[in-house]
Amino acid sequence: MAWFFAPEPVMVTADEALKGGRHPVLENPAPHTVLGTPVTGPWKEGQQRIWIGLGCFWGVEQMYWQMDGVEGTSVGYAGGFTPNPTYREVCSGRTGHTEIVEVVYDPSKISLEQLVARGLEAHDPTQGFRQGNDVGTQYRSAYYTENEEDAARVKAVVDAYGETLKQHGFGEITTEIGVISPSEYFLAEDYHQQYLDKNPDGYCPHHSTGIPCGVEA
């Protein structure tokens, strides 16, 4: 019996990436179907945001909109090169983007560290360009912030969790941490927004390691 293996995904370069579109794929998003909040603002005074990639964004968005202190979520693409990408383009692996959830939160009710820890516990951050059977650079683990201070706070939580995972026999964490501007986050199509609210029987599993992060709630 012959076995055939797909090649490992490779990150596209800026020169190789698709050129993208001139206009966003979702220019006038409807309010959040669960929270009722505007997807693109205006935000309340004091609200903050972070962009989180843990694999398939459907289940990740649902997980975060259910958390106390989270006041807005949306799904989209970030971390790559192609402006205004479509879902199909992102899935081709030729945009450099990963599937992302934007989380808008009230820092007086929930901390950045708690949001990061919840994400780490909900997926396997050692899998590189995959989560479970979902394979591709668009499924990579990532946290993006608006400033270096928040990125450093994210890194501290991720590094500590990496040491915990090593003690349990896991490999190196491959989570990408970076600073982006809001203009570098591109909303996904309306079909994907709050997908599991619109499609209660939809399927989007988490791939947790089962190892707690240790950040206090």
UniProtKB/Swiss-Prot annotation:
EC number from the UniProt entry: 1.8.4.11
GO cellular component terms given for this protein: cytoplasm
Active site: 56
Gene3D superfamilies assigned: Peptide methionine sulphoxide reductase MsrA
Signal peptide as annotated in the record: none
Reactions accelerated catalytically: L-methionyl-[protein] + [thioredoxin]-disulfide + H2O = L-methionyl-(S)-S-oxide-[protein] + [thioredoxin]-dithiol; [thioredoxin]-disulfide + L-methionine + H2O = L-methionine (S)-S-oxide + [thioredoxin]-dithiol
Keyword Membrane annotated: no
Highest taxon above the source species: Bacteria
InterPro entries assigned to the protein according to its UniProt record, in alphabetical order: Met_Sox_Rdtase_MsrA_dom, Met_Sox_Rdtase_MsrA_sf, MsrA_MetSO_reductase
One MF annotation (Gene Ontology) recorded for this entry: L-methionine-(S)-S-oxide reductase activity
Listed GO biological process terms: cellular response to oxidative stress; protein modification process
Keywords for this protein: Oxidoreductase
Entries under NCBIfam families matching the protein: msrA
Function description: Has an important function as a repair enzyme for proteins that have been inactivated by oxidation. Catalyzes the reversible oxidation-reduction of methionine sulfoxide in proteins to methionine.
Similarity comment: Belongs to the MsrA Met sulfoxide reductase family.
Protein name: Peptide methionine sulfoxide reductase MsrA
Protein species of origin: Corynebacterium glutamicum (strain R)
Lineage, top ranks: Bacteria, Bacillati, Actinomycetota, Actinomycetes, Mycobacteriales
